[in-house]
């Protein structure tokens, strides 16, 4: 192996033959990943790197048989470092791969939804199948928060949805597969466990105004069946960054206006990402926006998430889950846009929780 001196990003899987490739930014070329004895572990890490929850299958192909298909050369895995790696890109480097055999992998699908393709104030009614990962988290039958399906049995949401007064798990239900809250066609499942981030300070000090790490995972009592109206969302790949000004969509059944009624039908609204420099300005939030948060909305207000949208998704056109609705001042106020948790900054936390807490029950904390 050569020293890992190349800048790497943008892993991808070919839709034709499932070959796994990594873009070498230094050379401006795509490289194949040389097959090894650790293909199963590498396949899992590869899928995580791209934002998928897990690998479903893997195999090896021979470049002399199937061709290079626009790729140029290989990366090899340092198998000694692999068991301790959180990112595949940390343990690969350019190599010769003399056998010419490379990894192909199939990841759990995500992001499928019906097209065409507004806590939502100023939004519009959504239609069935447009946001099939959206769930309603209900306590004693009442909608409290939104969430997003990551798999058939894991939901990503906000930690602040689970204060001490709402921790009897038998009273929680997860509702999905419908856009109307009173739809008889949606599915409702019980909750086995809630794992919230141990760094969410308001759970340690009720007077804390620090809202970083506002993230939690809900493990369902049994897996949901995937249908046209129930699908998992895609997590961001390891190297995907938020782009200031990019317009994405926030969805939820939250209040239609501040202290107003909750939406009976799922709402959707398109809002632009605001830079943290602007959002931390004295006229906005005055340095309350921490590195793992960001703002989205319009400086003049009018369109925003609101109470009851917390925990729900902020998704871009590529069906990649960028953030979780976290907090804000009022709803749709001028210079007080919605504040969101950056999901990409918690990828390793998400994967670790799912790997280590599949048998857990009750309320669990995980740093």
Predicted regions and their residues:
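Extracellular "complement/coagulation-type" protease architecture
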Residues: 1-310, 315-367
């Amino acid at each position: 192996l050569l020293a890992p001196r190349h800048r790497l990003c943008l892993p991808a899987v070919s839709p034709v033959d499932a070959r796994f490739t990594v873009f070498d930014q230094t050379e401006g070329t795509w490289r194949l990943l040389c097959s090894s004895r650790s293909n199963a572990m590498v396949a899992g890490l590869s899928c995580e790197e791209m934002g998928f929850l897990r690998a479903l299958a893997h195999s090896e192909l021979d470049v002399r048989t199937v061709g290079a298909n626009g790729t140029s050369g290989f990366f090899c895995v340092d198998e000694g470092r692999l068991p301790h790696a959180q990112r595949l890109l940390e343990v690969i480097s350019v190599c010769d791969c003399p056998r010419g055999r490379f990894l192909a992998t199939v990841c759990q699908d995500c992001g499928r939804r019906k097209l065409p393709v507004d806590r939502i104030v100023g939004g519009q009614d959504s239609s069935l199948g447009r946001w099939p990962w959206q769930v309603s988290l209900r306590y004693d039958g009442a909608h409290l928060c939104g969430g997003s399906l990551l798999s058939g049995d894991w939901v990503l949401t906000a930690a602040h949805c689970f204060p001490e007064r709402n921790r009897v798990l038998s009273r929680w239900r997860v509702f999905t597969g419908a856009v109307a809250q009173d739809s008889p066609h949606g599915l409702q499942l019980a909750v086995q466990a809630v794992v919230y981030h141990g760094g969410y300070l308001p759970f340690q000090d009720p007077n804390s105004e620090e809202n970083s790490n506002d993230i939690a995972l809900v493990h369902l009592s049994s897996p949901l069946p995937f249908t046209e109206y129930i699908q998992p969302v895609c997590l961001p790949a390891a190297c995907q960054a938020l782009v200031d000004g990019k317009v994405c969509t926030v969805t939820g059944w939250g209040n239609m206006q501040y202290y107003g009624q909750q939406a009976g039908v799922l709402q959707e609204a398109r809002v632009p990402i605001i830079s943290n420099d602007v959002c931390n300005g004295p006229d906005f939030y005055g340095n309350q926006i921490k590195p793992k948060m960001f703002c989205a909305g319009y400086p003049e207000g009018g369109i925003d998430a609101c109470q009851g949208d917390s925990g729900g998704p902020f998704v871009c056109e590529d069906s990649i889950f960028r953030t979780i609705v976290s907090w804000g001042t009022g709803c749709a106020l001028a210079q007080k846009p919605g504040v969101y948790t950056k999901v990409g900054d918690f990828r390793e936390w998400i994967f670790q929780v799912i790997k280590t807490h599949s048998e857990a029950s009750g309320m669990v904390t995980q740093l």
